[in-house]
Amino acid sequence: EXFRDVNKQDVLLFIDNILRSVQAGSEVSALLGRMPSAVGYQPTLSTEMGSLQERITSTKEGSITSIQAVYVPADDSTDPAPATTFAHPDATTVLPRGLAAKGIYPAVDPLDPTPTMLQPWIVGEEHYETAQGVKQTLQRYKEPQDIIAILGLDELSEEDRLTVARARKIERFLSQPFFVAEVFTGSPGKYVSPIETIKGFQMILSGELDSLPEQAFYLV
């Protein structure tokens, strides 16, 4: 805050990880003899988190932009600590273990984030419509997962099998060949423009690339 208010600077604040602040507050609360909540957190969790997050704001003197890592205990997003934290950021990005297990990096769930900037008047109508089409296809793929796991793809209708095939291609197309990950993936890093990315998704959604195998879309 001194950098913003006294030095009149714009500040970029990284917090790794915000749950440590919650745990510290829980320990202090226990030392003070306060009755914990049902899950064991301090009764003042919401107030403490609000006080911290409200300090990360812009003023006439400068701004503070924060990027925060949030550990989700036992992958339970309803846990009071992450649930209270998620009420404050402008946007969230979720990194599920399932995608990482498939070898898809970055393991970002396209159905879970809340991007405030993904609006047609900000990114453009074409970008917005393509993103919505991708999310709808992935959502339709997510619904019959139990049927696929138990009975296999043969029990799905022709339309559903086509949706599953395109969704799997989209999943792999969402992987990115990072320069920093060359030693792990064996694939050279490369830059891909947003225009090329949008065009690629449109071709998958329209069925132009139905003849290609899933692996052809991995790290391209």
From Swiss-Prot:
EC category name: translocase
Superkingdom classification of source: Eukaryota
Main location: plastid
CDD domains named in the record: ATP-synt_F1_beta_C
Membrane topology, record value: Peripheral membrane protein
Disulfides per UniProt: none
Subcellular location: Plastid, Chloroplast thylakoid membrane
EC number: 7.1.2.2
Keyword Oxidoreductase carried by entry: no
Reaction(s) catalysed (UniProt annotation): ATP + H2O + 4 H(+)(in) = ADP + phosphate + 5 H(+)(out)
UniProt similarity note: Belongs to the ATPase alpha/beta chains family.
Name recorded for this polypeptide: ATP synthase subunit beta, chloroplastic
Gene name linked to the record: atpB
